[in-house]
Amino acid sequence: MAGLINFEDEQEVKQFLDNLGVEYSYQCYREKDPEGCHRLADYLEGVKKNYESTAQVLQHNCEVNAHAQSCYKLGAYHVTGKGGMKKCLKTAYSCFLKSCNTQGKKSVDACHNVGLLAQDGRALETGPDTTVARQYFEKACEGGFAPSCFNLSTLYIQGFPGLDKSMPLALKYALKACDLGHVWGCANASRMYKLGDGTDKDEQRAEELKNRAKDLHGQEKERQLKFGE
Protein backbone atom coordinates (compact mmCIF):
# COMPACT_ATOMS: atom_id res chain seq x y z
CA MET A 1 0.00 0.00 0.00
CA ALA A 2 1.38 3.38 -1.04
CA GLY A 3 2.61 5.64 1.69
CA LEU A 4 3.44 2.93 4.21
CA ILE A 5 6.99 2.57 5.45
CA ASN A 6 8.71 -0.77 4.95
CA PHE A 7 10.36 -1.09 8.36
CA GLU A 8 12.41 -4.05 7.14
CA ASP A 9 14.16 -1.76 4.65
CA GLU A 10 17.00 -0.11 6.59
CA GLN A 11 17.52 2.67 4.04
CA GLU A 12 13.82 3.51 3.91
CA VAL A 13 13.62 3.67 7.69
CA LYS A 14 16.71 5.89 7.84
CA GLN A 15 15.19 8.27 5.28
CA PHE A 16 11.92 8.33 7.22
CA LEU A 17 13.70 9.21 10.48
CA ASP A 18 15.85 11.86 8.81
CA ASN A 19 12.70 13.46 7.38
CA LEU A 20 11.16 13.48 10.86
CA GLY A 21 14.16 15.39 12.17
CA VAL A 22 13.85 17.98 9.41
CA GLU A 23 10.11 18.33 10.04
CA TYR A 24 10.53 18.82 13.79
CA SER A 25 13.35 21.33 13.27
CA TYR A 26 11.11 23.32 10.92
CA GLN A 27 8.23 23.24 13.43
CA CYS A 28 10.51 24.45 16.18
CA TYR A 29 12.65 27.12 14.56
CA ARG A 30 10.53 28.31 11.61
CA GLU A 31 6.99 27.87 12.92
CA LYS A 32 8.02 28.71 16.50
CA ASP A 33 5.91 25.80 17.76
CA PRO A 34 6.84 24.81 21.37
CA GLU A 35 5.38 21.32 20.88
CA GLY A 36 7.50 20.94 17.75
CA CYS A 37 10.57 21.92 19.76
CA HIS A 38 9.83 19.29 22.36
CA ARG A 39 9.28 16.69 19.62
CA LEU A 40 12.66 17.69 18.22
CA ALA A 41 14.26 17.21 21.64
CA ASP A 42 12.65 13.77 21.97
CA TYR A 43 13.86 12.90 18.47
CA LEU A 44 17.43 14.01 19.16
CA GLU A 45 17.47 12.12 22.44
CA GLY A 46 15.65 8.94 21.46
CA VAL A 47 16.65 8.47 17.81
CA LYS A 48 19.95 10.31 17.39
CA LYS A 49 21.24 9.80 20.96
CA ASN A 50 22.67 13.30 20.67
CA TYR A 51 22.27 14.49 24.25
CA GLU A 52 24.19 17.74 23.79
CA SER A 53 21.85 18.87 21.01
CA THR A 54 18.88 17.62 23.02
CA ALA A 55 19.95 19.75 25.97
CA GLN A 56 20.27 22.85 23.77
CA VAL A 57 16.77 22.39 22.35
CA LEU A 58 15.33 21.79 25.82
CA GLN A 59 17.03 24.92 27.11
CA HIS A 60 15.67 26.98 24.20
CA ASN A 61 12.15 25.61 24.63
CA CYS A 62 12.16 26.17 28.38
CA GLU A 63 13.70 29.64 28.41
CA VAL A 64 11.99 31.06 25.31
CA ASN A 65 8.68 29.17 25.26
CA ALA A 66 8.27 28.18 28.94
CA HIS A 67 7.28 24.70 27.78
CA ALA A 68 6.45 22.70 30.92
CA GLN A 69 7.66 19.32 29.68
CA SER A 70 10.91 20.73 28.29
CA CYS A 71 11.59 22.61 31.54
CA TYR A 72 10.99 19.40 33.48
CA LYS A 73 13.38 17.41 31.31
CA LEU A 74 15.96 20.21 31.36
CA GLY A 75 15.80 20.09 35.15
CA ALA A 76 16.50 16.36 35.03
CA TYR A 77 19.50 17.03 32.75
CA HIS A 78 20.88 19.50 35.30
CA VAL A 79 20.44 17.00 38.15
CA THR A 80 22.79 14.53 36.44
CA GLY A 81 24.86 16.86 34.23
CA LYS A 82 23.56 15.12 31.11
CA GLY A 83 24.15 16.53 27.64
CA GLY A 84 26.92 18.86 28.75
CA MET A 85 24.59 20.74 31.08
CA LYS A 86 26.18 21.95 34.30
CA LYS A 87 25.37 19.55 37.13
CA CYS A 88 23.59 21.95 39.45
CA LEU A 89 20.66 21.29 41.79
CA LYS A 90 19.90 25.01 42.07
CA THR A 91 19.43 25.30 38.32
CA ALA A 92 17.44 22.05 38.30
CA TYR A 93 15.23 23.49 41.05
CA SER A 94 14.56 26.61 38.93
CA CYS A 95 13.65 24.45 35.92
CA PHE A 96 11.30 22.26 37.95
CA LEU A 97 9.73 25.34 39.54
CA LYS A 98 9.09 26.87 36.12
CA SER A 99 7.54 23.64 34.87
CA CYS A 100 5.39 23.32 37.99
CA ASN A 101 4.04 26.86 37.69
CA THR A 102 3.43 26.54 33.94
CA GLN A 103 0.89 23.73 34.42
CA GLY A 104 1.44 21.49 31.42
CA LYS A 105 2.64 17.95 30.86
CA LYS A 106 4.98 16.83 33.65
CA SER A 107 4.08 19.89 35.75
CA VAL A 108 2.79 17.70 38.58
CA ASP A 109 6.00 15.64 38.53
CA ALA A 110 7.96 18.90 38.56
CA CYS A 111 6.04 20.17 41.61
CA HIS A 112 6.97 16.93 43.39
CA ASN A 113 10.64 17.46 42.51
CA VAL A 114 10.50 21.03 43.85
CA GLY A 115 9.17 19.57 47.09
CA LEU A 116 11.94 16.97 47.23
CA LEU A 117 14.70 19.52 46.61
CA ALA A 118 13.22 21.96 49.13
CA GLN A 119 13.05 19.21 51.74
CA ASP A 120 16.62 18.14 50.97
CA GLY A 121 17.86 21.74 51.07
CA ARG A 122 20.88 21.49 48.80
CA ALA A 123 19.15 23.52 46.08
CA LEU A 124 18.28 26.39 48.43
CA GLU A 125 20.55 29.07 49.84
CA THR A 126 18.82 28.79 53.22
CA GLY A 127 18.95 24.99 53.45
CA PRO A 128 16.01 22.62 54.01
CA ASP A 129 12.62 24.35 53.94
CA THR A 130 9.75 22.15 55.08
CA THR A 131 7.20 24.90 54.46
CA VAL A 132 8.12 25.11 50.77
CA ALA A 133 8.32 21.32 50.53
CA ARG A 134 4.81 20.99 51.98
CA GLN A 135 3.46 23.66 49.62
CA TYR A 136 4.69 21.87 46.49
CA PHE A 137 3.88 18.38 47.71
CA GLU A 138 0.33 19.66 48.29
CA LYS A 139 0.20 21.04 44.76
CA ALA A 140 1.38 17.74 43.28
CA CYS A 141 -0.90 15.71 45.54
CA GLU A 142 -3.89 17.78 44.43
CA GLY A 143 -2.83 16.95 40.87
CA GLY A 144 -3.07 13.24 41.64
CA PHE A 145 0.62 12.46 42.19
CA ALA A 146 0.61 9.67 44.78
CA PRO A 147 4.25 9.98 46.00
CA SER A 148 3.60 13.60 47.00
CA CYS A 149 0.54 12.59 49.03
CA PHE A 150 2.64 9.92 50.76
CA ASN A 151 5.45 12.39 51.45
CA LEU A 152 2.96 14.80 53.02
CA SER A 153 1.77 11.99 55.24
CA THR A 154 5.30 11.23 56.44
CA LEU A 155 5.96 14.94 57.06
CA TYR A 156 2.93 15.13 59.34
CA ILE A 157 3.87 11.88 61.09
CA GLN A 158 7.31 13.23 61.99
CA GLY A 159 6.73 16.97 62.37
CA PHE A 160 9.38 19.52 61.41
CA PRO A 161 10.24 23.14 62.20
CA GLY A 162 7.38 25.15 60.71
CA LEU A 163 5.22 22.03 60.38
CA ASP A 164 3.56 20.63 63.48
CA LYS A 165 3.08 16.90 63.84
CA SER A 166 -0.53 15.97 63.03
CA MET A 167 -1.66 12.36 62.88
CA PRO A 168 -5.14 13.23 61.51
CA LEU A 169 -3.47 15.03 58.57
CA ALA A 170 -0.97 12.18 58.23
CA LEU A 171 -3.90 9.78 57.90
CA LYS A 172 -5.69 12.06 55.43
CA TYR A 173 -2.74 12.08 53.04
CA ALA A 174 -1.92 8.40 53.56
CA LEU A 175 -5.49 7.58 52.51
CA LYS A 176 -5.24 9.82 49.46
CA ALA A 177 -1.94 8.18 48.50
CA CYS A 178 -3.61 4.80 48.94
CA ASP A 179 -6.56 5.83 46.75
CA LEU A 180 -4.02 6.79 44.08
CA GLY A 181 -2.37 3.36 44.27
CA HIS A 182 0.55 3.94 46.65
CA VAL A 183 1.34 0.70 48.51
CA TRP A 184 2.94 2.34 51.53
CA GLY A 185 0.16 4.89 51.79
CA CYS A 186 -2.26 1.98 52.27
CA ALA A 187 0.10 0.23 54.70
CA ASN A 188 0.57 3.33 56.85
CA ALA A 189 -3.15 4.13 56.88
CA SER A 190 -3.89 0.53 57.87
CA ARG A 191 -1.51 0.77 60.80
CA MET A 192 -3.02 4.09 61.94
CA TYR A 193 -6.51 2.56 62.02
CA LYS A 194 -5.18 -0.51 63.81
CA LEU A 195 -3.51 1.59 66.52
CA GLY A 196 -6.09 4.37 66.63
CA ASP A 197 -3.40 6.88 65.68
CA GLY A 198 -5.01 10.07 64.36
CA THR A 199 -8.40 8.38 64.31
CA ASP A 200 -10.57 5.96 66.27
CA LYS A 201 -9.45 2.33 66.22
CA ASP A 202 -11.13 0.42 63.41
CA GLU A 203 -9.92 -3.15 62.91
CA GLN A 204 -12.16 -3.71 59.88
CA ARG A 205 -10.91 -0.60 58.08
CA ALA A 206 -7.33 -1.52 59.01
CA GLU A 207 -7.80 -4.96 57.45
CA GLU A 208 -9.35 -3.49 54.29
CA LEU A 209 -6.40 -1.16 53.81
CA LYS A 210 -3.92 -3.94 54.58
CA ASN A 211 -5.52 -6.09 51.86
CA ARG A 212 -5.45 -3.14 49.46
CA ALA A 213 -1.71 -2.78 50.13
CA LYS A 214 -1.21 -6.50 49.47
CA ASP A 215 -3.16 -6.28 46.20
CA LEU A 216 -1.14 -3.28 45.02
CA HIS A 217 2.12 -5.01 45.96
CA GLY A 218 1.05 -8.08 43.98
CA GLN A 219 0.20 -5.93 40.96
CA GLU A 220 3.64 -4.29 41.12
CA LYS A 221 5.37 -7.68 41.23
CA GLU A 222 3.26 -8.88 38.30
CA ARG A 223 4.18 -5.81 36.25
CA GLN A 224 7.86 -6.38 37.02
CA LEU A 225 7.61 -10.02 35.92
CA LYS A 226 5.90 -9.06 32.66
CA PHE A 227 8.51 -6.38 32.03
CA GLY A 228 11.24 -8.99 32.47
CA GLU A 229 9.72 -11.46 30.01
Swiss-Prot record:
The record's Gene Ontology cellular component field reads: mitochondrial intermembrane space
Give the protein's biological function: May be required for assembly of mitochondrial respiratory chain complexes.
Q: Where in the cell is it found?
A: Mitochondrion intermembrane space
Annotated stretches, region: Disordered: 197-229
Similarity comment text for this entry:
Belongs to the hcp beta-lactamase family.
**InterPro entries membership:** HcpB-like, Sel1-like, TPR-like_helical_dom_sf
Name listed for the protein in its UniProt record: Cytochrome c oxidase assembly factor 7
Entries under Gene3D superfamilies matching the protein: Tetratricopeptide repeat domain
Per UniProt, the keywords (alphabetical) are: Mitochondrion, Repeat
